[in-house]
Amino acid sequence: MEEKLQILHDILKRSGYSTTKARRLIFQLLHDQEPQSMHAIYLRTNGEVDRASLYRIIRIFEQAGIVQRVYVGWKYKIELTDIFSHHHHHISCLGCHKLIAIQEDEQIEKLIQELATKHQVIATSHQLEVQGYCSDCQRTKQQPLLSGN
């Protein structure tokens, strides 16, 4: 964790910001966690960071490349970028809004690189979003009827 806090400090310093107690706390709350909503992060601060400060910190973290948004339908959750964790994608359940992490997959990465090459693009980053219904929601019929069902 100390190594990652040093990386956080270096990134913030390069971006013109200092490593405050509140910024360190938000980083620690996101470390080794599933993507979290802003509300969930706010609750986990136990009043140590007010809501306005949380939104400012997340905006700074996004601009500096420390965190990224993971979209779940039209809403989003926040997670640390690949600088701090292994590269992965998500499947989001439209029924219960659970996020399922897909660990790095060589086939997906190869396809993305092939598409970038085909379209003469140098890909610097990407996010793959898959939406559907998890096995629990399929079992409990929490998905809309699809044609053919």
Model-derived regions: residue spans:
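Short alpha-helical segments that sit at the start of domains
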Residues: 2-27
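Short, locally clustered residues in the helix-turn-helix/winged-helix DNA-binding domain
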Residues: 28-32, 46
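Non-DNA-binding regulatory cores of transcription-related proteins
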Residues: 64-149
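Short acidic, hydrophobic short linear motifs in intrinsically disordered regions
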Residues: 36-45
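Short capping segments at the starts of secondary-structure elements
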Residues: 21, 33-37
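Basic amphipathic alpha-helical segments that dock to polyanions
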Residues: 54-65
